[in-house]
């Protein structure tokens, strides 16, 4: 016999189940963004979501608050990680263009940077001499 109620724990459990399914489907839909360990986190999300869905009515209010905060933080970091992975793949595809742009910037800086003195005349270090005291 299962006892369920529609409350914040049930909604949180459904949310975690949806996020777990999303991570699992991500490997099939966009394999260049997905990593191998996403399957592990997908299983954890499904398990925790199922527990909250079926047993969430037993939670104390403070424990429910901690579950809400922890799940919200986890979902935020999942979204941020996927966003950064997608941008990393975009940058890797544009790497050749970025390297050319860097070379042009450095070339411009060095061509327009002129010193009044010659390189041999520049002294950046100052030597400090000391003598040991004789006892």
UniProtKB/Swiss-Prot annotation:
**Cellular component GO terms held in the UniProt record:** chloroplast
**Where in the cell is the protein located?**
Plastid, Chloroplast
Note the Pfam families from the entry.
Ycf66_N (PF07444)
Q: Which domain of life is it from?
A: Eukaryota
Keywords (A to Z) from UniProt: Chloroplast, Plastid
Q: What family classification does the UniProt entry report for this protein? A: Belongs to the ycf66 family.
Q: What is this protein called?
A: Uncharacterized protein ycf66
List the source organism: Marchantia polymorpha (Common liverwort)
Give me the gene this protein comes from.
ycf66
């Amino acid at each position: 016999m299962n006892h369920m109620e529609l409350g914040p724990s049930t909604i949180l459990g459904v949310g975690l189940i949806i996020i777990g399914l999303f991570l699992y489907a991500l490997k099939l839909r966009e394999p260049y963004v997905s990593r191998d360990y996403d399957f592990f986190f997908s299983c954890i999300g499904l398990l925790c979501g199922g527990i909250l869905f079926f047993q969430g009515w037993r939670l104390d209010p403070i424990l429910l608050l901690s579950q809400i905060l922890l799940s919200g933080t986890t979902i935020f970091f999942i979204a941020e990680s996927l966003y950064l992975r997608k941008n990393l793949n975009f940058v890797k595809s544009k790497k050749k263009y970025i390297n050319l742009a860097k070379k042009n910037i450095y070339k411009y800086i060095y061509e327009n940077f002129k010193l009044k003195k010659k390189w041999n005349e520049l002294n950046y270090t100052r030597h400090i001499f000391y003598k040991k005291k004789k006892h």
